[in-house]
């Protein structure tokens, strides 16, 4: 027994010394601050290209590469500030944001996949740009937010990517926290905070009309519009009103009247919804279970694709 104790003590000492040696190994300071070699991969909507950010002159810039090719094209040449983010506007144009000297007043820019036709869309001093809706099915338009009128409040604008024209769609009184468009890119829903704690849904039939309050909920209640139906008349909504689990329902946005229950789970709240702009249909809903994500499919093709991916990528979480 004494010998065993000595062996254990010696082993413990060796392991401890090993850990101490690893702990004393210094990590170069620049490793914490240097740019990644490549980051932010995104596939173009048509699947022909992918983009990423990589260093050029010690600053993160945009690169585009055709799928199947080994050659990448740098399409921006920033040398003062890193690009803060990017997104595909359509199959041939990419949007990106950057600020000035770290002021976090991010401005929106655009450039073609070959680096031509660069545009500064929101180069306004001391004004910050946010993306409200990329309008995936409308190539030339995007909905953005600008605090141009009031530094503390973001108003919604429709931006024409071809000519840079900005059209203000509403004036935020200060308590609007979110906006929602229909499938034609029309801004028709607003989400506000009232009385400091309650949530209010506002609606309008057309952009020519003012927003009007439709429903106010407290912290115990949930009504969340996910997206409009393909005909833009109803909305798919997640709600727990009248039930103890959040369900997917068909709802009239003008009244918040529940028309039909589309899916509910006995154990879990609905946490996500999948809608295909290409197919113009609801494809799935998801719940967060205690062992992972639970999905219900409305589209058999989508289910088959995901099943095949899960088989090929066993052990990975596919989102």
What are the functions of these language-model segments?
Residues 72:
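Active-site-proximal cofactor/substrate-binding loop regions of enzyme domains
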Residues 12-13, 23:
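Cleavable N-terminal signal peptides
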Residues 19-25:
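Sec/Tat signal peptide C-region and signal peptidase I cleavage site
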Residues 33-39, 45, 57-62, 77-84, ...:
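Peripheral, non-catalytic segments that deliver or gate enzyme domains
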Residues 1-11:
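Bacterial N-terminal signal peptides that target proteins for export
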């Amino acid at each position: 027994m004494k010998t065993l104790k000595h062996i254990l003590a010696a082993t413990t000492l060796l392991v401890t010394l090993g850990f101490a040696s690893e702990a004393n190994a210094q990590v170069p300071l620049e490793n914490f601050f240097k740019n990644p070699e490549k980051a932010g991969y995104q596939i173009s909507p048509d699947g022909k290209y992918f983009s990423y950010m990589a260093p050029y002159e010690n600053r993160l810039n945009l690169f585009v590469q055709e799928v199947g090719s080994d050659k990448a094209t740098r399409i921006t040449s920033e040398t003062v500030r890193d690009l803060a983010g990017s997104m595909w506007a359509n199959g041939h144009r990419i949007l990106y944001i950057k600020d000035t000297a770290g002021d976090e007043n991010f401005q929106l820019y655009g450039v073609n996949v070959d680096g031509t036709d660069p545009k500064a869309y929101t180069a306004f001093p001391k004004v910050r740009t946010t993306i409200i809706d990329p309008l995936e099915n409308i190539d030339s338009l995007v909905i953005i937010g600008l605090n141009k009128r009031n530094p503390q409040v973001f108003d919604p604008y429709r931006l024409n990517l071809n000519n840079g024209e900005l059209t203000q769609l509403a004036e935020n009184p200060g308590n609007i926290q979110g906006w929602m468009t229909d499938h034609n890119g029309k801004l028709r829903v607003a989400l506000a905070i009232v009385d400091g704690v309650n949530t209010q849904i506002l609606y309008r039939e057309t952009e020519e009309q003012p927003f009007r309050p439709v429903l106010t909920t407290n912290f115990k209640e949930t009504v969340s519009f996910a997206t409009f139906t393909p005909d833009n008349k109803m909305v798919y909504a997640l709600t727990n009103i009248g039930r103890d689990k959040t369900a997917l329902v068909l709802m009239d946005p003008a009244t918040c009247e529940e028309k039909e229950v589309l899916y509910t789970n006995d154990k879990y709240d609905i946490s996500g919804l999948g809608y295909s702009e290409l197919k113009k249909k609801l494809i799935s809903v998801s719940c967060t279970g205690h062992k992972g994500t639970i999905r219900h499919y409305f589209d058999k093709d989508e289910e088959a694709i995901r099943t095949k991916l899960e088989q090929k990528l066993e052990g990975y979480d596919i989102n």
